[in-house]
Design a protein with these regions (language model features):
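Alpha-helical elements of Rossmann-like donor-binding domains used by nucleotide-donor carbohydrate transfer enzymes
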Residues: 31, 35, 71, 101, ...
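Short alpha-helix in the alpha/beta-hydrolase fold that links the catalytic acid
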Residues: 51, 65-74
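Nucleotide-sugar-dependent glycosyltransferase donor-binding/catalytic pocket residues
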Residues: 62-65, 92
Length: 115
């Protein structure tokens, strides 16, 4: 399980897919991979937008390249990178304390923009 350390959440996700197989994710198509790589290259060359950004990643991330995320966020003047200790890829499907911190940080970002 590369998604979450929360066993109950993972069991719930598995039950959802068993009950509704159409919700399951398959592998990407070659067309999707090609388009994604093209977009990633374009975004890597572009400067960070002049906007606030919150990026929350799990410390144990094994799906996306955490080093690339760290590098991008280091170049984002209004960006904030939070690494959640012990978390996997899906921080909003993690244990309650991780999920709550992530949602609180997002709400604080939105509140700051509304002020």
């Amino acid at each position: 399980n590369l998604l979450t350390t929360d066993r109950d959440t993972y069991a719930w996700m598995q039950a959802q897919v068993r009950a509704h197989p159409e919700l399951g994710l398959g592998g990407p198509s070659l067309g999707w991979v090609g388009a994604a790589l093209e977009e990633v290259r374009a975004l890597a060359r572009a400067p960070s937008p002049d906007l606030p950004c919150l990026c929350v990643c799990g410390e144990n991330e094994r799906i996306v390249d955490l080093a690339a995320i760290r590098a991008r966020m280091a170049r984002w003047p209004k960006g904030r990178l939070v690494i959640e200790p012990g978390a996997e890829h899906e921080v909003l499907m993690e244990r309650a304390e991780i999920r709550d911190r992530t949602l609180d940080a997002a709400a604080a970002l939105f509140d700051a923009q509304a002020a």
